[in-house]
């Protein structure tokens, strides 16, 4: 088989780049004919995947962390439409922990990821799209495969994306550090949520959305006070399912409400989330 591989050497604190020769040799045993692109800046992966699909490549593999995988996924779409509906996407997560891997029953780490590709099957999966605002107020849209969220989790993702602490102390330590910092700075966040048969103004700590079965699984975690935020982090919130969710902060919410997709900062509310059923061929 042939494949176009998007590779981020800086993922996993630079360990992916150090292991590149081993990764290349392991991939070649599965895909004897490959083309490679090494990312050097944010957003490059999406542009290169889009160009590769238009050039006729039918198998795209992303090797890296959450950001690389999400960027590559976004390259499959342009202006709300699929660039090449018959193309196949797969990913090799090079980190030590991944919610995306857990969703699809995969082990993190490049060795486990490539080993799984040897017997992986292609199936249609749902993706979702969020339309929101950038930090500067410009409309943006992002596709996601695993999950998106806004509120406290979005703030944590935004902080992680701009900090260098993970490179020196590891992702797990950095996540705990930024989670604590975000919680200490947390202020009441009230958001209007509109979905199928649901319209409510709620005090939230975070709202998580994941595409599954043609709908969005939505979990709303309460957060009127810091004590309630701590409690919500230890228990499941209210759940609903809808093909679409619109969220907008109320006037008494201080500061922007951050949005993240697959662990990467995407923008701020207001936002609309919608599912695209069976929109991607995923080798998993």
Feature annotation, model-predicted:
Residues 1-63, 70, 74, 111, ...:
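ATP/NTP phosphate-donor binding region
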Residues 6-8, 62-64, 91-93, 146-147:
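Short beta-strand segments
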Residues 8, 66, 128, 156, ...:
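A residue-level signal for conserved active-site and pocket-lining positions in enzyme catalytic cores
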Residues 20-22, 53, 77-78, 161-162, ...:
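Short, solvent-exposed amphipathic alpha-helical segments in soluble enzyme
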Residues 39, 77-207, 212:
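Catalytic core of DAGKc-family lipid kinases
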Residues 68-70, 99:
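Short, active-site-adjacent cap segments at secondary-structure transitions
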Residues 212-284:
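ATP/nucleoside-binding phosphotransfer catalytic cores, i.e., glycine-rich phosphate-binding loops
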């Amino acid at each position: 088989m042939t494949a176009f591989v998007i590779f981020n050497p800086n993922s996993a604190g630079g360990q992916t780049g150090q292991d590149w020769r081993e990764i290349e040799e392991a991939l070649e045993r599965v895909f004897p004919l490959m083309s490679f692109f090494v990312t050097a800046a944010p957003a490059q992966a999406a542009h290169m995947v889009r160009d590769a699909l238009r050039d006729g490549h039918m198998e795209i593999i992303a090797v890296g962390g959450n950001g690389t995988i999400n960027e590559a996924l976004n390259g499959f779409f342009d202006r709300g439409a699929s660039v090449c509906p018959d193309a196949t996407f797969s990913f090799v997560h090079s980190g030590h922990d991944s919610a995306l891997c857990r969703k699809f029953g995969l082990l993190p780490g490049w060795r486990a990821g490539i080993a799984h590709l040897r017997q992986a099957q292609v199936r249609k999966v749902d993706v979702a799209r969020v339309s929101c605002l950038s930090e500067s107020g410009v409309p943006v849209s992002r596709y996601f495969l695993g999950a998106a969220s806004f509120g406290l989790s979005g703030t944590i993702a935004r902080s992680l994306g701009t900090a260098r602490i993970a490179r020196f102390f590891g992702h797990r330590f950095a996540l705990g550090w930024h989670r604590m910092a975000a919680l200490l700075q947390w202020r009441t966040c009230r958001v209007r949520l509109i979905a199928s048969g649901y319209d409510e103004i709620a005090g939230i700590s975070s709202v998580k959305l994941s595409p599954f079965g043609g709908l969005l699984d939505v979990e709303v975690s309460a957060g009127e006070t810091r004590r309630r935020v701590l409690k919500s982090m230890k228990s499941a919130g209210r759940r609903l399912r809808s093909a679409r969710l619109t969220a907008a902060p109320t006037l008494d919410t201080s500061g922007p409400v951050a949005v993240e997709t697959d662990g990467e900062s995407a923008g701020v509310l207001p936002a609309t989330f919608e599912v695209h059923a069976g929109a991607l061929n995923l080798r998993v």
